[in-house]
Design a protein with these regions (language model features):
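Short, well-ordered, mixed-charge alpha-helical segments that flank or form enzyme active sites
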Residues: 85, 116-117, 141-143
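Active-site metal-binding motif and surrounding structural segment of the metallo-beta-lactamase
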Residues: 88-134
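A short helix->loop->beta-strand "cap" motif at the edges of active sites that frequently abuts
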Residues: 74, 127-131, 147-149
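A generic "binding-loop/recognition-motif" signal
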Residues: 65, 113, 138
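Metallo-beta-lactamase
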Residues: 1-86, 96-100, 134-156
Length: 156
């Protein structure tokens, strides 16, 4: 269970965070050399754009942690990443561009790690939605990054 402490920060039930020193990282890199995967089998992505505008509920995986789903007539886009980001190259292109997506009722961002909070993707998608659901204290960062009039609702 994660709760907000008196200083406004979030702490997990187990205090698993610790400070890493440079020598710890160096030791890890030297003792665990990088070995790329031997083969990648890519998923086949079918273009089913017509289903994205249907009235029925659906869930569509857009790659990595990006999802678009419709529930009760509301479309919600989670952690959109449409291109390559540092240290994470897409094995297959995104199945849809932001312009291909139907109107988005809510943009939901889970946290600010670069593979979930991609500034170029957020700038693109901000043209197609006006509402963002965010963790506490993330609204200012999103508005600075996107430079649009997104209405930000911060949730605990």
């Amino acid at each position: 269970m994660i709760k907000q402490n008196k200083k406004g920060r979030f702490d997990g039930a187990l205090n698993s965070l610790r400070t890493l020193r440079f020598r710890d990282v160096l030791k890890w890199k030297l003792l665990h050399p990088y070995s790329p995967a031997k083969s990648h089998k890519c998923l086949v992505v079918k273009d089913e754009h017509e289903k994205l505008i249907a009235a029925q509920d659906y869930l569509c995986w857009l790659g990595h942690a990006s999802f678009l789903f419709q529930l009760g007539g509301k479309r919600i886009l989670i952690d959109p990443v449409f291109g390559n980001i540092p240290f994470y190259k897409r094995n297959i292109p995104a199945p849809y561009t932001p312009a291909m997506l139907p109107n988005i009722d809510f943009l939901l961002l889970s946290h600010t790690h670069y593979d979930h909070f991609d500034a170029p993707s957020l700038r693109q998608i901000s043209k197609y939605t006006k509402q963002a659901l965010l963790p506490l204290q993330m609204g200012c960062l999103l508005k600075r990054t996107v430079k649009s009039n997104l209405h930000c609702t911060e949730l605990n």
